Curated annotation (Swiss-Prot):
Gene that produces this protein: rpsR
Annotated protein name in UniProt: Small ribosomal subunit protein bS18
GO cellular component: cytosolic small ribosomal subunit
Family: Belongs to the bacterial ribosomal protein bS18 family.
Function: Binds as a heterodimer with protein bS6 to the central domain of the 16S rRNA, where it helps stabilize the platform of the 30S subunit.
Length: 79
């Protein structure tokens, strides 16, 4: 009763920070930070963004700093 087996296709993930050629993540760069936030306002997971552990940590800290300064919303009310 087993279904057909699927072949796994290994695609190389594109790291958004590397494609933009940014040395450091800045909390003032809201256009870049919005790529890592869901439409609900949550920080996207590392497995979704494709970032390394260090880069994900830098992005998360930058998003939190931008939220503190009201550059980014804490949560969205989109329904």
């Amino acid at each position: 009763m087993a279904g057909p087996q699927r072949k796994s296709v290994n695609k190389k993930k594109v790291v958004p920070i590397k494609t933009v050629h940014i040395g450091a993540v800045d909390y003032k760069d809201t256009a870049l930070l919005r790529k890592f936030i869901s439409e609900r306002g949550k920080i996207r997971a590392r497995r979704v963004t494709g970032l390394s552990v260090q880069d994900q940590r830098k992005v998360a800290i930058a998003i939190k700093n931008a939220r503190e300064l009201a550059l980014l919303p804490y949560a969205s009310t989109a329904r």
